[in-house]
Design a protein with these regions (language model features):
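Basic polycationic patches enriched in arginine
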Residues: 9-13, 20, 28
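Extreme N-terminal basic, low-complexity initiation segments
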Residues: 2-8
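Active-site-proximal alpha-helix that buttresses catalytic centers in soluble enzyme cores
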Residues: 24, 31-196
Length: 196
């Protein structure tokens, strides 16, 4: 839907940048055996239906857009990974485990795509994990969180209204975010302003 298109925009920007850089290097005959990968990182959820409708849907769209890339998922929340293992016997990878797997597969270029809405605690941990693997790949880059630039707030507000207006009609609508102790908590107030 509209929201998924909005969420996929950062990965397209990042992927195009990586591809242009690779083309530049290849033109000079320096490197020609690029093995590309996209790592989709979400906070995760302990609700299987929600996971299928949202996280898995994004993964399917990314695989369809980039069929020549290795596409893997990772769950940034340790609590969610542990709950998935205990309740569903699913071994979800952490971002570090997924990057290690890609390294073992001989991946050379990685685009890390967080589905995080704000650039908060989880996203900063993800960036730190990616930094630790900088030497393991020829190139690794992390896309922005959904709300990274001022225009992102306007785009997301518009996408939300477009996807919800028929269902909501004239009724009041309450949207909630759980907040964070991180400075990125200000993102919620900025989003509220964009929605007014």
């Amino acid at each position: 839907g509209v929201i998924h298109i909005c969420i996929l925009r950062p990965i397209r920007r990042l992927w195009n940048t990586l591809y242009r850089q690779h083309a530049y290097i290849t033109e000079r005959g320096m490197q020609n055996n690029m093995k590309k990968a996209i790592l989709i990182v979400s906070f995760g959820t302990t609700y299987p239906d929600t996971r299928q409708k949202n996280i898995a849907a994004i993964t399917r769209q990314v695989r369809a857009l980039y069929p020549d890339a290795v596409v893997e998922e990772a769950v940034s929340s340790t609590i969610v990974r542990n709950a998935m293992k205990k309740r569903e016997h699913i071994e979800a990878k952490s971002p570090t485990e997924a990057l290690e797997s890609m390294k073992k597969q001989g991946v050379t270029h990685v685009a890390v795509f967080p589905t995080h809405v704000i650039d908060g605690i989880e996203n900063h941990r993800l960036k730190e994990a990616a930094k630790k693997y900088a030497g393991a790949f020829e190139q690794i880059a992390v896309a922005d969180a959904l709300l990274a630039k001022p225009q992102d707030y306007e785009d997301v507000a518009k996408a939300l209204w477009e996807s919800l207006k028929e269902e909501v009609g004239d009724f009041p609508l309450i949207l909630m975010g759980h907040g964070t102790e991180h400075a990125a908590d200000a993102s919620y107030a900025m989003m509220e302003q964009s929605l007014r």
